[in-house]
Amino acid sequence: MTRTAKLTIIPPGRPLSGRAMPPGSKSITNRALLLAGLAKGTSRMTGALKSDDTRYMADALRAMGVAIDEPDDTTFVVTGSGRLMPPKAPLFLGNAGTATRFLTAAAALVDGTVVVDGDEHMRKRPIGPLVEAMRTLGIDVSADTGCPPVTVRGTGRFEADRILIDGGLSSQYVSALLMMAAGGDRPVDIELVGEDIGALGYIDLTTAAMKAFGARVEKTSPVTWRVEPTGYRAADFVIEPDASAATYLWAAEVLSDGQIDLGVPNDAFTQPDAKAYETIAKFPHLPAEIDGSQMQDAVPTIAVLAAFNETPVRFVGIANLRVKECDRIRALSTGLNNIREGLAVEEGDDLIVHSDPALAGQTLPAEIDTFADHRIAMSFALAGLKIDGITILDPDCVGKTFPAYWRTLAALGVTYQGKD
């Protein structure tokens, strides 16, 4: 399939209205796929996301002996034997951070060698803290650059009473170890060390999914979890819509003064990015300072929205955005300054947006480099709702988590140049 080189958004000039259901949660889908793959028996996952990231996870599990059927666009039927098998070739996971981190840890439960690799972007994303934690368990694991590829020479088991992990860079390291730990031989305490972890809510998603698949896990302190060696059992599992995807629709609604029905109440989400709704709803009077540490994937959405706010906005607690699919702080400042020089400034790991509501209605031709990052593409599309001339480069990168994004906006009344 030929990729679209660029897409120019035509400001609709009217409120956006209609029903727009976000896809299933990427974070929950990839957790559930792995847990179902580790379980013995057949699990049925409904409401699931079918996207680049979840396809990478599903294909990797297939390569490790798990049978996965897809009877429709939102369902996975997963049949596992209770044990993952060594794949015949390296696992290629594109730029899927969840799949890469989760499968690196799960590879310790494989009796054989597993190589976890990704594309040129994934090969720049750090995985050292997870590798170091696994080594302390006696697991033979190597990552020469501190980034993928990672080679795990597993024995199918590990023994540990306690695992220390620095989750300062990513909560995914912690989630990976938690899911691995239920396959151990004895109870394990997993304890955070180092810098305060961001996005603790994603660990709550992990433990909730683990419990749904039969694991026993308990939070014994603010930084410690105890996991029993239960393994996993097959389960039917319903996946809620993606809160990160919902943020674009919430922002489109307030920017256009429209009315968009997401098909699910705003308070029904359990994902961390759902916290963004209360912030977005305050537009055009966003707070002067926004802490993005607990809603990291929503920061690009709110940063572009902030360009049209009544007063400037400083984003703090977002250092982790530098090691996402791209350096999102740099990508946001670059894109905003392409729209108008001086619109954004980086101060250390903070981002300051010098808001100007007068931007709305102007013609400001700007090509937005997405750096192949789905969230940069989807966020800057919002600017195109109010400014004439916004062109998104590599718009198909949204396929990572929201393949129907452009069609969804079109159904609400947005038109484009450069895409059918």
Curated annotation (Swiss-Prot):
One Gene Ontology biological process: aromatic amino acid family biosynthetic process
Binding site for 3-phosphoshikimate: 26-27, 31, 170-172, 297, 320, 324
GO cellular component labels: cytoplasm
Subcellular location: Cytoplasm
Keyword annotations of the record: Amino-acid biosynthesis, Aromatic amino acid biosynthesis, Cytoplasm, Transferase
MF (Gene Ontology): 3-phosphoshikimate 1-carboxyvinyltransferase activity
Region feature Disordered, mapped onto this chain: 1-24
Superkingdom in the source lineage: Bacteria
Reaction catalysed by this enzyme: 3-phosphoshikimate + phosphoenolpyruvate = 5-O-(1-carboxyvinyl)-3-phosphoshikimate + phosphate
Pathway(s) where this gene product acts: Metabolic intermediate biosynthesis; chorismate biosynthesis; chorismate from D-erythrose 4-phosphate and phosphoenolpyruvate: step 6/7
InterPro entries per record: Enolpyruvate_Tfrase_dom (IPR001986), Enolpyruvate_Tfrase_sf (IPR036968), EPSP_synthase (IPR006264), EPSP_synthase_CS (IPR023193), RNA3'P_cycl/enolpyr_Trfase_a/b (IPR013792)
Transmembrane segments: none
Free-text function comment from the UniProt entry: Catalyzes the transfer of the enolpyruvyl moiety of phosphoenolpyruvate (PEP) to the 5-hydroxyl of shikimate-3-phosphate (S3P) to produce enolpyruvyl shikimate-3-phosphate and inorganic phosphate.
UniProt subunit comment: Monomer.
Cross-referenced PANTHER family: AROM/DEHYDROQUINATE SYNTHASE, PENTAFUNCTIONAL AROM POLYPEPTIDE
Protein known as: 3-phosphoshikimate 1-carboxyvinyltransferase
Organism: Rhizobium etli (strain CIAT 652)
Phylogenetic placement of the source organism: Bacteria, Pseudomonadati, Pseudomonadota, Alphaproteobacteria, Hyphomicrobiales
